């Protein structure tokens, strides 16, 4: 939206965390004008003493920035990224599953759940146990296992409460953190921008639907 003559910005939501690659491919969103780009610098955590932490797509560059706050935290940062990415793979596979017809679950329904085997083979049963454990955690519990710097802990915990009406001490904010990291390839706080603004995403989806024969009606009366 134009908030001043010649100046436009996204007024509500300004970035995309992730879109399922299958959706982009199946709907041919790129052919209908969707242009997504990913910045190198994804987040900045400000510090009163000017020891700001910059989060980059490259975890090693992020670690170098974290070192201004804590050498210990900087050292474990790459391992933390890999750990969270491994847990988020279970969610990514879960999101690929068509929900079974409960309570009548047959062999066909079980076959659709085969995508869950991929992260299980890659990370083992210990990885599945870690996923269940992290998903149930609140942010301070997870932070206690990894970081000492308050700024690092706060910046990472922000991902656990993003887009939900809960605080970091709420149970299962670990699940939300993992959800935010799906399809992020070990890039913590990963974000994408839509060229032309977030409204362009809605326009692209509309064009895609119309190209498939959908008629979009607005200001139409709906009977409940």
Write out the residue ranges for each language-model feature:
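Short loop/edge segments at beta-strand edges and connector loops
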Residues: 38, 218-220
């Amino acid at each position: 939206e134009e908030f001043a003559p010649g100046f436009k910005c996204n007024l509500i939501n300004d970035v995309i965390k992730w879109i399922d690659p299958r959706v982009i491919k199946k709907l041919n969103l790129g052919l209908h004008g969707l242009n997504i780009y990913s910045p190198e610098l994804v987040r900045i955590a400000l510090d009163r003493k000017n020891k700001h932490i910059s989060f980059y797509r490259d975890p090693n560059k992020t670690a170098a920035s974290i070192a201004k706050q804590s050498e210990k935290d900087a050292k474990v940062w790459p391992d933390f990224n890999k750990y969270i990415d491994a847990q988020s793979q279970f969610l990514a596979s879960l999101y690929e599953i068509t929900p079974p017809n409960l309570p009548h679950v047959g062999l066909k329904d079980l076959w659709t759940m085969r995508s869950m085997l991929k992260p299980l083979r890659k990370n083992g049963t210990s990885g599945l146990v870690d996923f269940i454990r992290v998903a149930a955690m609140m942010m301070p519990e997870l932070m206690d296992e990894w970081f000492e710097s308050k700024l690092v802990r706060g910046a990472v915990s922000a991902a656990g409460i993003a887009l939900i009406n809960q605080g970091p001490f709420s149970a299962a904010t670990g699940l939300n953190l993992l959800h935010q990291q799906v399809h992020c390839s070990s890039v913590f706080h990963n974000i994408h921008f839509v060229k032309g603004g977030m409204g362009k995403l809605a326009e692209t989806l509309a064009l895609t639907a119309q190209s498939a024969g959908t008629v979009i009606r607005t200001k139409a009366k709906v009977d409940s």
